[in-house]
């Protein structure tokens, strides 16, 4: 089904999937946090140009390092979330009936990726809500603790799961489509490399395999992110201003009425850029860590 499945046959322990996923999530979250913060600001109905937004954040919110605001909850979400996601995905692949039909195998990748992400997304929803509000300038949170206390005081436990429905509508399709296109791209790129480099097997050559992983990550990341961007924008609105955006349908109607179709594209470029690179880093580091056996 995939290289991940092959490593399982070679005896890769589940703990290695946890550690490799955490490593990939940590690297992607720390390096790309500025893009995540800017994407959140774009989606909270701000009409400033990107250069103007960056300049205002740097000049009025604490300098260049203010672009990394919200890094801690991002790290907590990405490291533990990616770790659990890869563990659960590997578990599903290990126990699910294996299909010899290529089309059925791709469909398995689609539903397994979506199901694993939805389950992990629910478990880490509180961290996601805290991260989004901490990145926004709509709230005057100075610490992570102050954001937790304020949400609990004003909204109770439900506040930490605000926007889960629209988040699931974003994450499950995105993850499913990502795994689907990732494995499909790897399969086709391996064939392409083999066709033009018959003397060197891509499957067994580390540099070629890494190139294939990176290219597959970029292709699948950009495709899945572009398709699911409207759900991400609605998720951000619901989590930032729940008193205005009540739920998925209400938010969609409100955005369309006030901003038209263009409103659903808020943060599109930044999200496609960040998610494409982020997913590529996470998956490439994950597979690299497993193959290089850097995780003992």
UniProtKB/Swiss-Prot annotation:
It catalyses: glycine(in) = glycine(out). Belongs to the mitochondrial carrier (TC 2.A.29) family. SLC25A38 subfamily. This is Mitochondrial glycine transporter. Solcar repeats lie at residues 12-95, 104-188, 208-292. The lineage of its organism: Eukaryota, Fungi, Dikarya, Ascomycota, Taphrinomycotina. PROSITE patterns: SOLCAR. It is a multi-pass membrane protein. Pfam families: Mito_carr. Its main location: mitochondrion. The keyword Nuclease does not apply. One of its GO terms (cellular component) is mitochondrion.
